[in-house]
Regions:
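A short, polar/proline- and glycine-enriched secondary-structure boundary/capping micro-motif
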Residues: 38, 70-72, 133-136
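Core segments of cupin and vicinal oxygen chelate
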Residues: 9-56, 110, 158
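Non-heme Fe(II)-dependent double-stranded beta-helix
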Residues: 52-54, 74-75, 106, 143-145
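Vicinal oxygen chelate
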Residues: 2-7, 13-22, 63-151, ...
Length: 158
């Protein structure tokens, strides 16, 4: 008799993305000035953006990839966390515990990482830290972009 594993549908949401880049100034113009995200650059090789009370939604780390290097998935509860972890390990996918420093940079209590089908790191967590300060409203989306000519400094043609 086969047992159907519990459904995790509706219990998983995108929590954050991790991007490796050396173009911090371009990202700041895009994230803060064009989109209106709150900008946090407290560490020299790390920048974080957020749109809400969560400490981090976009984590930029200095490096040559110029690409997304990880997706962070917020799970609604520990049962969902345990179920996904069980499924991944049952299929032989290697799992590693994130460090306390990595969790702090992402604004989460704890994370577990495993590779996705194309090698992109998938990170799961259950609790995101919320910021004690409201997102900066200084650069709301559209404030500088009402005149379409201002968008040229935010978006490049490739």
């Amino acid at each position: 008799m086969t047992t159907t594993p519990p459904s995790v549908f509706g219990n998983v949401r995108l929590g954050y993305i991790v991007i490796e880049t050396n173009k911090f100034a371009d990202w700041r113009r895009f994230g803060q000035d064009a989109i209106g995200m709150h900008y946090d650059d407290t560490l020299p090789d790390v920048t974080r953006f957020r749109l809400d009370d969560n400490e981090c939604r976009f984590l930029l780390q200095r490096g040559p990839a110029e690409d997304v290097t990880a997706l962070g998935w917020r799970l609604d509860d520990h049962d969902t966390f345990d179920e996904i972890l069980s499924r991944v390990t049952r299929h032989g996918v290697p799992v590693t515990e994130g460090t306390a420093e990595e969790a702090a940079l992402r604004g989460v209590e704890r994370l577990v990482r495993f590779p996705g089908p194309n090698g992109l790191a998938q990170e799961i967590f259950t609790r995101a830290h919320t910021s004690s300060t409201a997102p900066s409203r200084r650069h709301r989306a559209g404030d500088d972009a009402r005149d379409a000519s201002n968008l040229k400094c935010y978006c490049r043609t490739y």
